[in-house]
Amino acid sequence: MYVTTLPSPLGDLYLASDGTALTGLWIAGQKYFASTLPAEVTENPSLPVFRQTENWLQAYFAKAPLPSLPPLRPEGSPFRQAVWALLQEIPSGQTRTYGALTQQLKAMGIPAAPQAVGGAVGHNPISILIPCHRCLGADGSLTGYAGGLEKKKFLLELEGAL
């Protein structure tokens, strides 16, 4: 497992990779920080997937046209994978409620409850690129962001969703 750190307007971002795909992206101080990392990691800032992620993040924070996402490989249960896949379908500048995601999962034949969806969203190991910040409470309120509500607000304002 390989790791590196990148500066950002949110503070340091910590990246992890299996060598070919991004497996983690955490904001400094984030809840569940690096929870999927093994004890042994190697610092390798020149890894191609890290360079691709850095280019994507630079464009994102500059509000420039986004290049292709780097390959992503988040680790999680099939339920969490389904939730994270739905998060990736939410366009920049838009949001969804936990309840709306729950209904989408049910329509796909996946039993779900908003609390379970919230748990999956909260344990997203690849922040920003899997846009869990686009998920809101039933009343449209900013709730539960592992990176902190101030950072969630910053990202949604950057995207024009607030």
Place the predicted regions along the sequence by residue.
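Basic nucleic-acid-binding alpha-helical/helix-turn surface characteristic of O6-alkylguanine DNA
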Residues: 1-108, 160-162
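…primarily DNA-binding HTH/wHTH and HhH modules…
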Residues: 138-162
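Short, basic interhelical loop/turn and adjoining N-cap
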Residues: 106-116
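Major-groove DNA-recognition helix of helix-turn-helix-type DNA-binding domains
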Residues: 129
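Short clusters of hydrophobic/aromatic residues that line enzyme substrate/ligand-binding pockets
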Residues: 72, 117, 142-145
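Short cysteine clusters
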Residues: 132
